Every structure is written in structure tokens, then in C-alpha cells.
Design a protein with these regions (language model features):
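Phosphate- and divalent-cation-binding pockets in alpha/beta enzyme and binding domains
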Residues: 42, 83-86, 119-120
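Generic structural signal for small/hydrophobic residues in well-ordered secondary structure
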Residues: 7-8, 43, 84, 103
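Active-site regions of enzymes building and remodeling cell-envelope glycoconjugates
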Residues: 121-126
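Active-site neighborhoods of divalent-metal-dependent phosphate/nucleic-acid chemistry enzymes
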Residues: 55-63, 67-113
Length: 126
């Protein structure tokens, strides 16, 4: 089953962080993994605010990690953006709300430690 990676899951995979659960690691090794453009947007904002640092030049680093790990990019559609308007307000984070909309539309599980995905009826792997 293909999976959509939450931003932290993608970054922790790239860093080989111990924060990433063993179950998440297993799934990310065995399944097709998608990283949404919304995660790249979130990363760019955090870089700009000084809340995140990446080794090397960010766009080159992220592109090389995507290629090296065989992850696929997921574009954001108008329909997915508009789907956010109908989501219950369980989660205020606009990045995660868009990941919810994408996961629902594409029927994907989400790799995330954030339990708020559970209330949207999405399979969460952690």
C-alpha cells in the first residue's frame, strides 16, 4: 500500500533519526512513498524562519534525498485545496490539513507520529 509521508517522517528518514519508529522505517523501506509539495512548502517556511537547518543547499539536498530513496513527489491539486474547506476542525495546522485532504482523496495511509490524523479516518502508520 503506497503511503504519504508527513514532513517530520520524511526529514527524520533523511537524517536517519532515532525519532522515526521502527514500524515507520519498515513501511518506508517496503512501500512506495510519496512526499507532498505541501511538505516542501512547510520545510521552506521553517528554513526561512530559522526553525530548521539542512545540510548543504536545501533544494539540492531535498532533491537528492528524494532520488536516493526513490520517493515520489505528490503535487497539490485545486480539488485537494478545496477539500480542506470541508474538513472538520480537529487540526489547525494548514500543512497537515492538506495532507489529510490528499490522503483521503488518494486513499493513502499517512506515516506520522501525529495522532490527530486518526480522527479523520485515515490509516496512520507509526
Amino acid at each position: 500500500m503506497p503511503v504519504l509521508l508527513d514532513t517530520h517522517a520524511f526529514l527524520w528518514w533523511c537524517e536517519d533519526s532515532p525519532e522515526l519508529s521502527l514500524k515507520a522505517r519498515k513501511v518506508m523501506t517496503e512501500e512506495d512513498c510519496f512526499v507532498s509539495y505541501v511538505s516542501f512548502w512547510e520545510i521552506a517556511i521553517k528554513l526561512n524562519l530559522g526553525k530548521l537547518r539542512l545540510p548543504g543547499i536545501p533544494d539540492r539536498y531535498l532533491a537528492s534525498q528524494m532520488s536516493l530513496n526513490g520517493f515520489e513527489q505528490m503535487e497539490i491539486s485545486f480539488r485537494q485545496i478545496m477539500r480542506c474547506a470541508s474538513l472538520a476542525r480537529h487540526h489547525g495546522d494548514p500543512f497537515d490539513r492538506l495532507l489529510v485532504a490528499q490522503a483521503q482523496e488518494k486513499e493513502l495511509a499517512v506515516v506520522s507520529r501525529d495522532a490527530v490524523f486518526d480522527v479523520y479516518g485515515i490509516k496512520r502508520i507509526w
